[in-house]
């Protein structure tokens, strides 16, 4: 599991168009905000995605690109992007190996049951590829604003 201060791993993962993308393809002037979510088109994930969409111009003003990551297929991502007018890249980790390496896949407790699945997480990575901040087990609603506020407070 990665920690703050670690170098961000740089695998090639397919985007919504099926094109393999790496960190250098996605990073903006100051860095990247990668949010890991369970599933396209579910209520919480839609809330999270549309909040990032609505705040994207503010993230760009701070020099950050926003990218989503889930197990969903490129086809599912395309439908999700189209339905909700999402202007950012969604990556696919079908076998969850990258999410597991990040610590965003594993055992979780929900409604009193223990299961294995996506642990909703966000990673703020600077331009040099170093993880500046990790948010784990986040609530979808309001999370994008919290990340933006934290980045704004940290930017001189």
Regions found by a protein language model. Give the residues of each.
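Chalcogenol-based redox active-site neighborhoods
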Residues: 1-156
